[in-house]
Amino acid sequence: VDTELPKNADQIRPALILVCGFARAGKDTLADGLQAGAINGAVKVSFAEPLKRKADQAIRDIIGPGVKFPGFQDEAFKVANRALLVELGKTCRAIRQDCFVELALDSICAPLSQGKTVIITDVRYSNELQRCADWAALRGVPLYTLLIYTDGIEAANEEEQTNFDLLLVRSATSSIGWTDRSRWKPGSADAIKRHGRGLASLMLI
């Protein structure tokens, strides 16, 4: 465990929470529970949000003005066109490995300064884990790391599996560790949310 859980209400502090796991493993659901249970409020941040916005903009630029499409905020559209996001993200990371984590870290200072916890909902790469841990340590921000699995949910592709394995190695060979690890059956959304609320209570966020 990187950060020891607080013992009493006097220790309530805004924290940085990293939710790690495969795509569709329940990370957003767990984050929803954490957000619902946060005493002083929490905001969710996703590495994928800038990628979705830029992908939407690229499609608009190509198909021309006046043509409507759902965009990557729409779940059905995202699922149907996930390959585009995967390849675009892979290309961007190959050019500049930390591009997405740097965008995310730039956006979290304001809510933390307002006393709100920040939950990064989609940590899947070892560099993301390490950069966030280093950022929190440098600023004295409590860091909590949560690893979630759902039975039957595996890596979307070989790159994700390789990088997730590296993430697990990084956590095992550094001081980061895991605050919580959980495994769920499919269809456990309500239970995952309850678990998130319970963790928020334990963390006193």
Model-derived regions: residue spans:
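Walker A/P-loop
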Residues: D28
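Small-molecule kinase domains that catalyze NTP-dependent phosphoryl transfer to phosphate-bearing small molecules
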Residues: P6, A23, A94, C99, ...
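Residues at the beta-strand->loop junction immediately N-terminal to the Walker
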Residues: C20
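Post-Walker A helix-loop "phosphate-sensing" segment adjacent to the P-loop in P-loop NTPases
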Residues: A36-K44
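ATP-dependent small-molecule kinase phosphotransfer cores
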Residues: E49-V118, R124
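Extreme N-terminal, non-catalytic leader segments
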Residues: V1-I17
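ATP-dependent NMP and nucleoside kinases share a basic, alpha-helical "lid"
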Residues: L103-L167
